[in-house]
């Protein structure tokens, strides 16, 4: 019998799929909702996982606040075991030019932060207690690290900083676990084969594919399988019970960037996000 449900965004491939695989393998009591933009790919992922009775595929487009709201309503009305874990994993990079969501928000910020903000705040009261929320960020979130990236990729790193600011502000609003919800940020490391380079120009995709085998020897580089196992553990493993308001690099809690602890910026981000959501009716 399934005694808990974990909702994972972006679960049709890459880190999200590996997180679902690890979670299903580690504990037979969990049901997994694959929250995906493309239901056909979600169903293919469910078939690959080989656990059709322990998985559900639900559609959500994080580039549309209306889609997120519809998803939340679907989750609330679908007979599922109590929702005890929410993994905010889906993300994208826009590597050339600028794109916008259905709601007129810059795409990288809209999907990586605002869509998940709408999801978390919409579903929060529906989570069974105790519950855990894990927000996937990135080591690139630190603005003090001058990467030399052009503007489009800087938008990605800024969105990852937003993920950490959001995590810490949410933890404060949940009284650091006193309300029964633990929330942490997660850096999976660099993951060759994760699909994040899918929007690169062809020459860069080729270079990335050729270099990937050599990158695997570096300490901050992990396979999606290993990072998926770490992410699943943070979402459901008993050893992380009660752990909240932390930033994890793999399985280890570390300090995030200095700017990510700026409470004024976190509050401004929260209030700006609320205003943006309020504009969508």
Predicted regions and their residues:
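Rossmann-fold NAD(P)H-dependent dehydrogenase/reductase core
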Residues: 1-200, 279-280
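C-terminal amphipathic/interface module of NAD(P)-dependent oxidoreductases
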Residues: 258-281
């Amino acid at each position: 019998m399934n005694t808990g449900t974990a909702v994972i965004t972006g679960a049709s491939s890459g880190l999200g799929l590996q997180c679902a695989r690890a979670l299903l393998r580690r504990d037979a009591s969990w049901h997994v909702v694959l929250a995906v933009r493309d239901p056909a790919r979600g169903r293919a992922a469910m078939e690959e996982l080989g656990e059709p009775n322990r998985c559900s595929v639900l559609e959500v487009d994080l580039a549309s606040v209306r889609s997120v709201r519809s998803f939340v309503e679907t989750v609330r009305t679908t007979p599922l075991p109590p929702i005890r874990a929410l993994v905010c994993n889906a993300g994208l990079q826009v590597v050339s030019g600028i794109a916008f969501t259905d709601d007129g928000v810059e795409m990288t910020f809209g999907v990586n932060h605002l869509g998940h903000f709408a999801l978390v705040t919409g579903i929060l009261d529906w989570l069974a207690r105790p519950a855990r929320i894990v927000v996937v960020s990135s080591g690139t979130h630190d603005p003090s690290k001058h990467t030399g990236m052009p503007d489009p990729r800087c938008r990605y790193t800024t969105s990852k900083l937003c993920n950490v600011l959001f995590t810490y502000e949410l933890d404060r609003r949940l009284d650091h676990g006193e309300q029964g919800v633990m929330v942490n940020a997660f850096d999976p490391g660099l993951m060759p084969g994760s699909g994040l380079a899918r929007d690169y120009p062809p020459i860069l995709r080729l270079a990335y594919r050729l270099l990937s085998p050599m990158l695997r020897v570096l300490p901050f580089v992990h396979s999606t399988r290993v990072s998926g196992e770490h992410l699943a553990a943070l979402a459901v493993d008993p050893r992380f019970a009660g752990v909240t308001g932390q930033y994890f690099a793999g399985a280890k809690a570390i300090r995030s960037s200095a700017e990510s602890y700026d409470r004024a910026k976190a509050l401004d981000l929260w209030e700006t996000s609320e205003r943006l959501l309020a504009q969508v009716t």
